[in-house]
Amino acid sequence: MKPSSLTLAFLVVFMMAIMYNSVQAEALADADAEAFAEAGVKELFGKAWGLVKKHLPKACGLLGYVKQ
């Protein structure tokens, strides 16, 4: 049984839509990553992580979890 040309055309259009959607999603992810980098999120996270590392042992020591 041979598929009709309408079926083949539908499959081609469907596959093109899937490929376009995947390329568009990748481009949006790249744009989001670039926007976060420009906003300095990495530096902000580094500062926050430094504060956590600085104050967490002291807080755990006060709660009795870590011997100082």
Swiss-Prot record:
In which compartments does the protein localize?
A: Secreted
In Swiss-Prot or TrEMBL terms, this protein is called U-poneritoxin(01)-Om4a
Q: How is it modified after translation?
A: Truncated sequences of this peptide have also been found in the venom. It is possible they have been cleaved in the venom.
Q: Per UniProt, which keywords does this protein have?
A: Antibiotic, Antimicrobial, Cytolysis, Disulfide bond, Fungicide, Hemolysis, Secreted, Signal
Q: Which source organism?
A: Odontomachus monticola (Trap-jaw ant)
A Gene Ontology biological process term: killing of cells of another organism
Task: Using the record, list the residue span of the signal peptide; answer none if the entry has no such feature.
Answer: 1-25
Identify the propeptide residues.
26-39
What is the tissue localization of expression for this protein?
Answer: Expressed by the venom gland.
User: GO CC terms for this protein?
Assistant: extracellular region
This molecule's function is given as:
This homodimer composed of two cationic amphipathic alpha-helical peptides has antimicrobial activities against E.coli (MIC=3.1 uM), S.aureus (MIC=3.1 uM), and S.cerevisiae (MIC=3.1 uM). It also shows histamine-releasing activity (66.4% at 10 uM) and a weak hemolytic activity (10.5% at 50 uM).
Question: Does the keyword section mention Disulfide bond?
Answer: yes
Query: Which family is annotated?
Result: Belongs to the formicidae venom precursor-01 superfamily.
Assembly: Homo- or heterodimer with PLP7 (AC A0A348G6I9); disulfide-linked.
Instruction: Indicate where this protein is primarily found.
Output: secreted
UniProt keyword Secreted, yes or no? yes
